Design a protein with these regions (language model features):
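ABC transporter nucleotide-binding domain
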Residues: 149-237
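ABC transporter nucleotide-binding domains
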Residues: 1-183, 189
Length: 238
């Protein structure tokens, strides 16, 4: 369960089942077992009602490259049933939130990868959904663009329920209030980023490189100085 005001990171290696799970959550493929409910609606039995509540950013967001950014967002708004003055307001809000003002009237096929990603993000929030589902929203972005997307997710997470997938722990630490780790389609861990880090064998560990000294002597010395320390020699370097 993901509540309003919660940002859930969906963490796992490539091929763990993150994208497949998100497609089931958003109703694009039916689950083979179990039930997915969005706002109380079974996505299999009431797909339209469930999808009205969600914004979805797939890993490769489909964009109509012959449209301008404004035209594409206007089309997405109309598909969502937003028209007239409300449509104009929705477009302005999405463009402002995703920092698209400078390319508002630019054709999508001329955009950089970063701006295309923001345009995909904008279509996901065009109808101001209560729930956002995003598949690796920062994948392929440069460091500045990643920072902008993380900041946007944190801001929106104050009033929405957000799920986003990643295979990078740094993404979870930077934006999430809770994280689930999956492997081969199964949950292997569930907790806050700090709780998951504390469970790691490498939590509160340090790596020391030693040059020109006998590693065994240093290991023995550390064991004497810090009685509770566990010293592991990873690689001997003369």
């Amino acid at each position: 369960t993901v509540e309003r005001g919660e940002i859930l990171g969906f963490l796992g290696p490539n091929g763990a089942g993150k994208s497949t799970t998100m497609r089931m959550i958003t109703g694009y493929i039916p689950p083979t077992a179990g039930v997915v409910r969005v706002g109380g609606n079974d996505v299999t039995e009431k797909p339209i009602e469930a999808k009205r509540l969600m914004g979805y950013l797939p890993e490769s967001a489909p964009l109509y490259t012959d449209m301008t950014v404004e035209g594409f967002l206007g089309f997405c708004a109309e598909v969502r049933g937003i028209k007239g003055a409300d449509k104009a307001k929705a477009i302005d809000r999405a463009i402002d939130m995703c920092f698209l003002k400078s390319v508002r009237h630019q054709s999508v096929d001329t955009l950089s990868k970063g701006f295309r990603h923001r345009t995909g993000f904008a279509q996901a929030i065009i109808h101001d959904p209560d729930i956002l589902v995003m598949d690796e929203p920062t994948d392929g972005l440069d460091p500045n663009q990643k920072h902008e997307v993380r900041s946007l997710i944190r801001r929106m997470g104050q009033s929405k329920a957000i799920i986003f997938s990643t295979h990078i722990l740094e993404e979870v630490e930077a934006a999430c209030t809770r994280a689930i780790i999956i492997d081969q389609g199964k949950i292997v861990a569930n907790g806050t980023p700090d709780e998951l880090k504390a469970k790691s064998e490498l939590a509160n560990s340090y790596v020391v490189s030693i040059n020109g000294t006998e590693s065994s002597a240093v290991r023995d010395g550390l064991g004497t100085v810090i009685q509770s320390a566990k010293v592991t020699i990873v690689t001997d370097k003369a």
